């Protein structure tokens, strides 16, 4: 008789393998004392934070050290054996709480869980029916049935189980090292025919934590594979993204076995390699129906929408709460762009639990969840479920009645709205929005902000257009980067520094262009001309070589100045660019005249060379400077530059150009500057750059910058101004 019972128990244990999850409440044969000991042993492996969560569920104090918390739970468990108060459900409930806290799952109240176990309302995670009380005291589980498999479901709405494959189930024990689980199974002909009957039917391998679940979450299991792991099915390594995000449960995806499935008469082999798993996993194969994001979107569209009145009431309540004694909030801004795709929303959705009016595109959200199922709101990061997603009637009405180019709308307290145009104008100086510049030759010019020109700017720059270009101050380059010219047009006597760089930046240029001639073999070097006929309204900041010097284009040296920035001036607004990304208005268009002054002042021989009378007048300079002193390339003596007193009070405080030159040994010495600062000497004529020519004439001809460039003392006559400071 005993042998028969033993055989029956063995058969029942084998039947347990056909379930994705076994019932941990079945191990009660050792009596209540053994259950209490097992619960205590499992409890002692928990961390302090986990112990506090258990105590909170038990309505015990959560203060004290780890040993104190453990003693409280031990005493609570030992009360199960009090005389006259035998409680067999207490250790069972504690085990469930321990299992749930190990996977960072929310814990129910102990009293609720205890009542559920006592009344038999606790459900097996696979079976759909309720387990009777007697089932909790037995080691046997109900036999496998297809109806039970059909009742099983996952938290992911993309998969609906149809049939669970027999013998394709395994449990992965905790492992401190490498491990491998092998599984062999056949798929019957009827299941093969089922897969062929519908294209949406697939054979998938699922994995999840082998833990008990209470009635609140029964029938809904998150997909989790060991991390890291590797799957090999019938000799093929599966590339499916089953691992998900590290340390984020429920972000994995099942593995698709359908393409590698063998015929019904052959055995399928599955190998799962894993490393260092601290929890038990159960893996199982299901034939499931796969739903596409578009199919799920159809379900969302059939649901009732979040009514407009609820949204307007929230807007009114929120704006009124933000009011204080000094500031009254009258409106808020709503973006019509999806935060996931950064494109115009078509199906604005959110949940009733989200405390914001901003929505996201439902279809884009479903596509993202099909890849990495985090199931968090992309705006507030709160957990959401598929069944909670709804279309916002208020936002949907705005999208339907707005032009395609509108990206934001302004919403008033009463729920009315109006489109916001030119939404790229995020930062602007209101003082400079309508700034009048007195220009001696051109009269009075009214400067107006034109933020819609951000797209036209790149086009005009590449096409060499000098009209309506925004002013640019590039502050993202380092000392070692090559100089990027601001204008496509170069005067015939100014040689581009780097033809390859210009070809990369301005692909529209070609060798046949009238503005670009790569065959300058003996072009005089010097400061760029300020003649309006050549440069019109665009000017570049750069360091300069000697007037009248010559060099071959192939020997053109790189810029040794640490400016690595350029400024162009137009009648448009000014913008600052970071990494050639989106532009932000920063400086006024009055920078045009300031650029002229800067160019003239940086000329080592004074502003009279290649400058207009207007520039000299702006600088307060009358007449011409002395002629250029002769340059002896074999002389080690420093040639003093002609100086001229002038007033620098008209220069703005934020235009300061830091320069670096050469030491006495002729080597380049660079000075690094802030990414948000531009420098220029306070009095450039008092300590302007001095040449340090090399004695070696051959070196001079080859590396002109190292022989004829200039050195400025930044410590004596320059100051640093941070544009980000007040």
From Swiss-Prot:
Class of the enzyme per the UniProt entry, highest EC level: transferase
Location relative to the cell: Nucleus
Main localization category: nucleus
Entry comment on modification after translation: Autosumoylated upon ethanol stress.
Zn finger (SP-RING-type) location: 323-408
Occurrences of domain PINIT (ranges): 139-291
Domain of life of the source: Eukaryota
Matches recorded under SMART domains: SAP
Spans through the membrane: none
Keyword Nucleus: yes
Ranges in a coiled coil: none
Region (Disordered): 507-533
Keyword Ubl conjugation: yes
GO cellular component: chromatin; cytoplasm; nucleus
Record-level GO BP terms: chromosome segregation; DNA double-strand break attachment to nuclear envelope; protein sumoylation
Every SAP domain range: 43-77
A molecular function (GO) term: double-stranded DNA binding
Its EC number(s): 2.3.2.-
Keywords: Metal-binding, Nucleus, Transferase, Ubl conjugation, Ubl conjugation pathway, Zinc, Zinc-finger
Compositional bias annotation for Polar residues: 510-533
Positions of Zn(2+) binding: 354, 356, 377, 380
Function in brief: May act as an E3 ligase mediating SUMO/Smt3 attachment to septins. May be involved in chromosome maintenance.
Further comment: Present with 3170 molecules/cell in log phase SD medium.
Quaternary state and interactors: Interacts with CDC12.
Family of the protein in this entry: Belongs to the PIAS family.
Name assigned to this protein: E3 SUMO-protein ligase SIZ2
């Amino acid at each position: 008789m005993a042998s028969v019972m033993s055989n029956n128990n063995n058969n029942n244990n084998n039947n347990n393998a056909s379930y994705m999850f076994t019932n941990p409440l079945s191990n009660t044969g050792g009596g209540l004392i053994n259950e209490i000991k097992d619960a205590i042993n499992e409890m002692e492996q928990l961390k302090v934070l986990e112990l506090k969560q258990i105590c909170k569920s038990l309505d015990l104090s959560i203060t004290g050290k780890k040993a104190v918390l453990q003693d409280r739970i031990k005493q609570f468990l030992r009360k199960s054996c009090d005389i006259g108060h035998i409680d067999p459900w207490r250790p069972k409930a504690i085990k469930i709480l321990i299992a749930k806290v190990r996977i960072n799952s929310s814990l129910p109240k102990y009293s609720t869980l205890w009542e559920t176990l006592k009344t038999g309302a606790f459900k097996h995670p696979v079976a759909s029916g309720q387990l009777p009380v007697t089932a909790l005291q037995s080691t046997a589980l109900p036999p496998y049935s297809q109806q039970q498999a059909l009742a099983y479901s996952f938290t992911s709405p993309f998969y609906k189980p149809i049939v669970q494959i027999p013998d394709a189930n395994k449990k992965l024990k905790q492992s401190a090292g490498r491990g491998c689980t092998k599984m062999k199974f056949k798929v019957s002909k009827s299941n093969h025919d089922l897969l062929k009957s519908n294209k949406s039917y697939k054979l998938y391998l699922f994995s999840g934590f082998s833990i008990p679940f209470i009635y609140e979450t029964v029938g809904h299991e998150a997909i989790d594979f060991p991390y890291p792991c590797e799957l090999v099915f019938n000799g093929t390594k599966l590339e499916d993204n089953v691992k998900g995000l590290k340390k984020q449960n429920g972000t994995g995806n099942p593995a698709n076995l359908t393409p590698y499935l063998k015929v019904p008469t052959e055995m399928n082999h599955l190998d799962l390699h894993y490393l260092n798993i601290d929890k038990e996993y159960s893996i199982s194969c299901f034939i499931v129906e796969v739903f596409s994001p578009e199919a799920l979107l159809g379900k969302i569209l059939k649901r009732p929408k979040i009514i407009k009145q609820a949204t307007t009431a929230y807007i009114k309540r929120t704006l009124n709460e933000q009011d204080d004694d000094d500031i009254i909030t009258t409106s808020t801004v709503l973006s019509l762009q999806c935060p996931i795709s950064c494109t115009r929303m078509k199906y604005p959705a959110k949940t009733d639990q989200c405390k914001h009016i901003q929505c996201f595109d439902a279809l884009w959200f479903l596509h993202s969840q099909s890849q990495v199922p985090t199931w968090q709101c992309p705006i507030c990061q709160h957990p959401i479920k598929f069944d909670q997603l709804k279309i916002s009637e208020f936002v949907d009405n705005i999208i339907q009645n707005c032009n395609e180019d509108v990206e934001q709308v302004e919403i008033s307290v009463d729920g009315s709205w109006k489109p916001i145009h030119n939404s790229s104008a995020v930062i602007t100086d209101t003082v400079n929005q309508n700034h009048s510049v007195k220009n001696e030759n051109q009269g009075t010019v009214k400067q107006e902000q034109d933020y819609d020109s951000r797209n036209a700017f790149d086009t005009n720059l590449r096409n060499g257009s000098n009209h309506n270009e925004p002013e640019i101050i590039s502050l993202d380059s380092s000392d070692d980067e090559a100089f990027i010219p601001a204008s496509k047009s170069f005067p015939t006597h100014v040689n581009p520094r780097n033809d390859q760089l210009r070809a990369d930046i301005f692909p529209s240029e070609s060798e046949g262009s009238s503005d670009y001639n790569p065959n300058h073999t003996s072009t005089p070097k010097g400061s760029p001309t300020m003649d309006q006929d050549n440069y019109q309204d665009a000017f570049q900041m750069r360091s300069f070589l000697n007037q009248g010097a010559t060099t071959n284009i192939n020997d053109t040296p790189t810029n040794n100045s640490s400016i690595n920035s350029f400024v162009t001036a137009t009648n448009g607004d000014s913008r600052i660019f970071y990494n050639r990304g989106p532009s932000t208005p920063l400086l006024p268009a009055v920078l045009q005249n300031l650029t002229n002054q800067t160019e003239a002042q940086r000329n080592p021989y004074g502003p009279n060379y290649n400058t207009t009378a207007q520039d000299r007048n702006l600088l307060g300079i009358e007449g011409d400077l002395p002629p250029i002193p002769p340059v002896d390339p074999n002389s080690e003596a420093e040639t003093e530059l002609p100086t001229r007193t002038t007033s620098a009070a008209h220069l703005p405080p934020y235009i300061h150009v830091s320069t670096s030159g050469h030491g006495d040994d002729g080597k380049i010495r660079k000075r690094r500057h802030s990414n948000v600062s531009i420098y220029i000497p306070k009095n450039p004529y008092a300590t302007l750059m001095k040449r340090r020519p090399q004695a070696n004439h051959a070196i001079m001809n080859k590396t002109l910058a190292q022989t004829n460039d200039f050195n400025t003392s930044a410590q004596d006559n320059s100051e640093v101004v941070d544009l980000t400071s007040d």
